[in-house]
């Protein structure tokens, strides 16, 4: 880290302080195409379905993502139900969110971020090991706009982390 350009320290928020280090890295050299591709299809039930053109192998990643989502949605709903019941007993009509619920949302966000990082890191290592120089991902711009697939499917679809 010889080329540190900037350090940013943000004050504590929710008990955590944020430190951002901006540094300069050397631009890696561009490798020429070798005709070996990895295509990635993003979906609802499987986060990523990948196809390796070199050996014809297909693999599916992302079922754990749905499991994480399901667990946290159930836990948040349970805690919210208890919290709202307690608040309505006190006569509070529109209760604020509790610290416990906020902590669960943060925990969910961190778990999803961690899982996506591990998944993409695994894909990068696979590409490096198999000498894949080009990864093709389907065009996902405007994928969520003006889509109506029913109430339940829309909820799942709009909850997917396509912007990451």
Region spans (language model):
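Positively charged, helix-rich recognition surfaces that bind polyanionic ligands
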Residues: 3, 13-164
């Amino acid at each position: 880290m010889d080329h540190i350009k900037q350090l940013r320290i943000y004050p504590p928020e929710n008990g955590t302080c944020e430190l951002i280090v901006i540094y300069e890295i050397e631009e890696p050299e561009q490798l020429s195409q070798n005709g070996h591709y990895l295509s990635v299809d993003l979906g609802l039930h499987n986060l990523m379905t990948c196809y390796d053109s070199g050996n014809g192998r297909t693999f599916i990643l992302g079922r754990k993502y749905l499991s994480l989502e399901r667990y946290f949605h159930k836990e948040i709903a349970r805690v919210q139900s208890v919290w709202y019941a307690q608040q309505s007993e006190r006569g509070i009509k529109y209760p604020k969110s509790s610290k416990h619920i906020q902590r669960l949302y943060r925990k969910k966000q961190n778990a999803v971020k961690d899982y996506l990082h591990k998944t993409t890191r695994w894909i990068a290592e696979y590409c490096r090991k198999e000498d894949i120089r080009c990864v093709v991902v389907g065009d996902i711009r405007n994928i969520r706009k003006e889509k109506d697939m029913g109430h339940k499917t829309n909820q799942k679809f709009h909850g997917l982390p396509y912007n990451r």
